[in-house]
């Protein structure tokens, strides 16, 4: 039997942790370094940190914040948001992340998954996928990017399979309908 794991996802916007409902109306709920440290003290198994506006704003990861979070948690730490190049992957890992989550940038440039897996190993490459119900899609779910703001033509199941074939070692599925 598989062991159940508690994985906490922190959505970060403008350097603050936020909480929204169905990817909308995010409100400030705290300072991300303090929240990460508190979850670590509560013995969560893994921490996922999403900069939910980096890709939409066309900027890279916030390395200083990643480094400060990494200094407080000693569990697997995955970071997503604004990671669009191999150098972004490298700098995010050097800042303290053990894994990177590729979402919008992977849709725009699927070879980033392959290159990242080749250089850093597929255990470091996580496909982050925001999906919502859509009867037009073969699986019944459509992929969205840029924090759920932009609809794609990708079927969620087909994209997940392709990402694994490209080298993604894990998938984090964010259900926009159940968020």
Regions found by a protein language model. Give the residues of each.
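Alpha-helix-loop-beta-strand connector modules within alpha/beta enzyme cores
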Residues: 9, 56-80, 111-130
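Structural motif
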Residues: 42, 50, 72, 95-96, ...
